[in-house]
Structures are given as C-alpha cells and as structure tokens.
Regions:
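Nucleotide-sugar donor-binding catalytic core of glycosyltransferases
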Residues: 1-199, 233-259
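Residue-level recognition of short, well-ordered coil/turn positions
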Residues: 179, 217-218
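A short, well-ordered alpha-helix in the C-terminal region of glycosyltransferases
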Residues: 219-233
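Conserved acidic donor-binding segment of nucleotide-sugar-dependent glycosyltransferases
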Residues: 197-204, 213-217
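Alpha-helical elements of Rossmann-like donor-binding domains used by nucleotide-donor carbohydrate transfer enzymes
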Residues: 205-212, 222, 226, 239-247
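Hydrophobic transmembrane alpha-helix bundles
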Residues: 200, 206, 227, 257-261
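Generic N-terminal initiation segments characterized by hydrophobic and/or small/turn-forming residues
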Residues: 118-121, 207, 217
Length: 261
C-alpha cells in the first residue's frame, strides 16, 4: 500500500521517502525526506518526528491528539496480500461477515459484545448467509487470500475498533472491497470526513440494527456506492499520493513566501 502511494507522489525536488515503525531511529538520508510512520496504535506524540532537521513532513497512522503542523494523518490502508477480483455487490455470498480475534474477557468488552450479538442473531427466525470466525492469537485465523475472499464476498462488513485504537485495518480493507461498513465513530482526521460507514456506538444493539439494514436493498446499494467513492477519492494509493503531493506543495509555497528559498 505504502509503496503504491509513493509512486503517486509528484514533486520536482529530490526527496527521499522513508518507511519506518514509530520506535525505529530516523535513518540518515542524502536529501530532505518525508516519513511514513506505522504501528503506534497508542497515538503517542514523538518529538523526533518534528525536531529532526532532515524531516520535512511526517505522515503517520494513528495520529496523536497533540497536533503538530509537520505531522499529518495517513490511512491505515490494507495489509500485504489483500488482493481479490471485484465481485458484483448483488452476487456476493455473505449478507454479513466478521473474522477476528477474541481476547480473554474482560480485555476487550467491545469484541465480546459483538460475539454475544452475533449469537443472538443466530436465534432469530430470519436466517442470513454469513461468515463469522472468532479465534485466539495474532494471525491464527484465515490466510490473507481466504480473508480477502470473505471480504469481497460480503455485502456488510462488521468493523469493530482495534484493541487500543478506534482505527483498524479491517475498516479500510472492507472499503476497498466495496462493503457496507458498520463501525463505531472515527477520529476527526481528513480522510474520515464523509466516511460512509453506518455508525454504531454499542454492539449489543446490533441484533436490532442489522436486520433492518439487510432488508433495505436501496440502502445497501447506496452505501456500497458511497464506500467505493470514498475509497477511490480518499484512501486509494492514487488519492493518498495526490494528498501528500498537495501537502508538500503547500509547504514549498509557504517556505518561498516566508523567504526560506
């Protein structure tokens, strides 16, 4: 995902692009650089990204609450291997799906509330085609090709927040697959503006919410189209590369205006 973004950054100056995890040291670079920083799910503020003389801008996942003009939000995107041919929305096998970990209680009440609600849905008279898998331990569930197949075959994707952050890769993978997304509120950052998900604040209410969504074909198709549009305009590698280009050009203009060039 990040390599594809980098291909769509269009600036005239020599500029190095560094991919790194938040806890790594910033490497020496020949030219001024921008950073792509990942993996800090605690949204912490790190001065090294704002004080380093060679760093022009930092684009990072999990934007901290403490804002800084040199630090910009970056979508999580999708994990390597999440690839699948597109499947017509009305031809998909599953009405809804979820595949993810289930930690020991009470570590994550959200995930247990989701599991309880999905079990309640199984008792309803109306039965749905679904794929639901809870498992213990990181990377103990589906392979990435299997997971992509489930997501691209789902009309509705249930996307609860991550354990330490309200953000999750699942949300963006569901968006890339054109699913109707049900999720909690998201942070106030640029790419979540006009995000197309159907908001839920309490997963225990899912049994009363999901059936009405699945019955409304017009609503499903509308949100499917909104999701595809949002992905293409806000989170696809092409659109994120264009966003980074705009931010770099704004910075270049400001430097010239203030007499730094």
């Amino acid at each position: 995902y990040f390599n594809l973004i980098a291909k769509h950054i269009n600036v005239q100056e020599d500029l190095d692009i560094v991919f790194m995890k938040w806890d790594q040291d910033i490497p020496k670079t020949k030219n001024k650089c921008i950073l792509f920083v990942t993996s800090d799910e605690h949204h912490k503020y790190h001065e090294k990204f704002t004080n380093h003389p060679n760093v022009i801008l930092t684009f990072r996942n999990y934007l901290p609450e403490q804002h800084h003009p040199k630090v910009k939000a970056l979508p999580l995107g999708y994990l390597q291997g999440f690839e699948h041919e597109d499947i017509n929305f009305n031809d998909r096998k599953y009405d809804y799906s979820f595949s993810g970990t289930l930690p020991d209680a009470p570590c994550d009440a959200t995930r247990h509330a989701l599991k309880f609600s999905l079990e309640r849905l199984d008792t309803l008279e109306q039965q749905y085609e679904k794929f639901v898998l809870f498992y213990e331990g990181w990377a103990k569930g589906l392979t990435m090709p299997e997971y992509a197949d489930v997501m691209y075959n789902s009309r509705v994707a249930l996307c609860p927040k991550g354990y330490t952050s309200s953000e999750t890769f699942r949300y963006f993978e569901a968006a890339r697959a054109g699913c109707v997304i049900i999720s909690e509120p998201k942070p106030d950052v640029w790419f979540y503006k006009d995000a197309p998900h159907i908001e839920i604040k309490d997963w225990l209410k899912l049994p009363s919410v999901l059936p009405s969504i699945l019955k409304d074909k017009d609503l499903l198709n509308h949100h499917h189209e909104l999701t595809k549009k949002w992905w293409e305009e806000k989170c696809s590698p092409e659109s994120v590369g264009a966003y980074i280009t705009r931010e770099l050009n704004k910075l270049k203009f400001r430097f010239r205006y203030e007499g730094y060039e």
